[in-house]
Every structure is written in structure tokens, then in C-alpha cells.
């Protein structure tokens, strides 16, 4: 509440349509907010396109042919697994509830390590303590077992198992304090609209939920007109829209937002080498913002898309825990 109040008082962020009671998870950037946002965008754009001869920019349209979203799997599978608490009537992402439970286990380990370090002082061997302390080993074993079960449920798209994990871990609703959960259901996140002059002849189109597809469909256009040779990248900054059912945490999770995205195209067999290099490059960029190196960490995905060999998020420690800022 302090951050939200400060952001409004000093002209950074306003609730959109505030004079008409606002619109959930939709915000306007004020006179200072827009300057700050533009500075970050400019810094990112220059780091991507001006410092790399083999990365160029585009600005693709928000509307795209609906077949693109069908082919990419978004129409059928761009979903969040949601669960309701019957007592509080609040809705949550089932996967996030479990991820938060895993994070609590990690925190328990770190607290045990911190206590031991304080007790033993300079003679403390952290690596040995983590490997031999019975309490730490017990927590790690439980965490690893839960992580394995959770990852399998995600990969199998097993909604019943996600709910069972929540029940077995005795996860409670933070509002009501109860464990009275509904079944887990999938909700598609894409906004639909109609394009055409008449209702009968209109085509169903979507507000893009991400900027990547605009890059992919323009790959050949950019490659041919720019005479680009692999490896090369295409970057863009643009609006994206997601019908977030669970929209909380201020501007961290909004229904209309901007993405800064770069897709880097490499030769088959070289993807993991480039993946490792870009991980470190992007982490250095974030740390250069001066917000504190200890505030960042990598988080490997538990569930990979069918086309991916690896996926990692860069997370930042928000007031409400570590959350993804880049992936």
C-alpha cells in the first residue's frame, strides 16, 4: 500500500479510469512514470540493437491473423490453472501456490544456514553444513520430492494432481485461513474481439498476449531485406494483453502491459551455448541498473514447451518475494 500510494502521490502510476472507480489491473503511467519507463526502454533498446551489429529491431502490429495463434498453440493451450477457495471466494493460480510452498522450504534451509553461521562464526563451513546437517537434509529431501511431483503434474497437465498436491501440503488460503479448495480449472488468457464491418461477416481476432509471434512471422522479411546471416537477433518493444484472472501485486501483473523482447536465431546444435551466454549477458544488464546484485537469481522452468531444450527466468526480489522480470 505504501508503494502504491507513493507511486500515485509523485506522479508515477495512476489507477486507470479512476474517476469512474477504476478498472482492475489496468494502470496509467503519470508524468514521472512515463519518463522512468522510457529511460528503461531506451537503455534496453540501445543495449540490444546499438551494441550488437547482428541484432535489429522491428515494430509489429498488435492484431495478427487468428491462424497464427492457432498454429502457435495459444488458442488451445495459453491457459493458467486456477483454483478457488470456497470460503474466501478468492481465486489463485494453483501452480503459484505450490511454487510459494517450495520457496518457503528454501527459506527454511537458508534460515538454518544463517543460524549456524552466526553460531560458529569464522570457522563455519557452509557447504559441509548443507551436506551433513540432518535438519537441512530433511527439508531438502522433502523439497526435492515435492518439486519432482510438481514438475510431473505440470508436464502431464494433470489438474487433479495439482489440487492433490495443494491438499497434501496443507496449503491454506491467506484470506480465510482454510483449506476448502475447489477443483483446478484451466482459463485461457487471450482477449477476443471482432474485426469487420458487420457482425455476420466479422472475423474473430485476438489482442496479442506476447510480442514474440510478430518477430517469428517477420523472420524471412528481416533476414532477406537486411541480408542477415545466422546468428542474428530481432528485437521489439510493444504492448501485450492478457486476461489475467488473478491480477494482483500492482503493476507487476497487469492486463495491458509492455514487453521488451529479443529473439536470437542460431544454427542447430549451438542453442545451448548461446543460451548460456545470453543468460549471463542479460543478468549483467539487470545488475547494472544498480538495484543490488543480491536481489537477482535464476529460476529454471519446471515445465518446458515442446520446442524448448531449456528455459530460465531472471527473478528479482520484490516486496512479495522473488518474481520473474525476464525469461
Predicted regions: what is each one?
Residues 1-327:
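TRNA-recognition modules of translation machinery and tRNA-sensing kinases, especially anticodon-binding
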Amino acid at each position: 500500500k505504501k508503494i502504491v500510494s507513493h507511486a500515485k502521490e509523485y506522479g508515477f502510476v495512476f489507477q486507470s479510469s479512476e474517476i469512474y472507480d477504476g478498472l482492475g489491473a489496468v494502470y496509467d503511467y503519470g508524468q514521472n512514470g512515463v519518463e522512468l519507463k522510457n529511460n528503461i526502454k531506451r537503455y534496453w533498446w540501445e543495449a540490444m540493437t546499438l551494441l550488437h551489429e547482428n541484432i535489429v529491431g522491428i515494430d509489429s502490429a498488435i492484431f495478427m491473423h487468428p491462424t497464427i495463434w492457432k498454429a502457435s498453440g495459444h488458442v488451445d493451450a495459453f491457459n493458467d490453472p486456477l483454483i478457488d477457495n470456497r470460503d474466501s471466494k478468492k481465486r489463485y493460480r494453483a501452480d503459484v501456490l505450490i511454487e510459494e510452498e517450495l520457496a518457503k522450504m528454501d527459506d527454511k534451509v537458508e534460515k538454518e544456514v544463517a543460524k549456524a553461521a552466526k553460531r560458529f562464526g569464522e570457522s563455519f563451513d557452509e557447504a559441509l553444513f548443507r551436506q551433513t546437517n540432518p535438519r537441512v537434509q530433511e527439508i531438502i529431501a522433502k523439497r526435492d520430492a515435492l518439486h519432482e511431483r510438481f514438475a510431473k503434474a505440470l508436464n502431464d497437465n494433470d489438474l487433479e494432481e495439482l489440487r492433490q498436491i495443494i491438499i497434501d501440503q496443507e496449503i491454506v488460503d491467506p484470506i480465510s485461513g482454510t483449506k476448502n479448495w475447489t477443483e483446478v480449472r484451466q482459463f485461457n488468457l487471450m482477449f477476443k474481439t471482432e474485426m469487420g464491418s458487420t457482425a455476420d461477416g466479422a472475423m474473430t481476432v485476438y489482442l496479442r498476449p506476447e510480442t514474440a509471434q510478430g518477430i517469428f512471422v517477420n523472420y524471412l522479411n528481416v533476414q532477406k531485406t537486411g541480408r542477415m546471416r545466422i546468428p542474428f537477433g530481432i528485437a521489439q518493444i510493444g504492448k501485450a494483453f492478457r486476461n489475467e484472472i488473478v491480477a494482483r501485486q500492482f503493476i507487476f501483473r497487469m492486463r495491458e502491459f509492455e514487453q521488451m523482447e529479443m529473439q536470437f536465431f542460431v544454427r542447430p546444435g549451438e542453442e545451448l551455448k548461446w543460451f548460456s551466454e545470453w543468460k549471463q549477458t542479460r543478468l549483467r544488464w539487470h545488475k547494472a541498473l544498480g538495484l543490488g546484485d543480491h536481489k537477482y537469481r535464476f529460476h529454471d522452468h519446471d515445465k518446458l514447451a515442446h520446442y524448448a531444450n531449456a528455459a530460465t527466468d531472471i527473478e528479482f526480489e520484490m516486496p512479495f518475494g522473488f518474481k520473474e522480470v525476464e525469461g
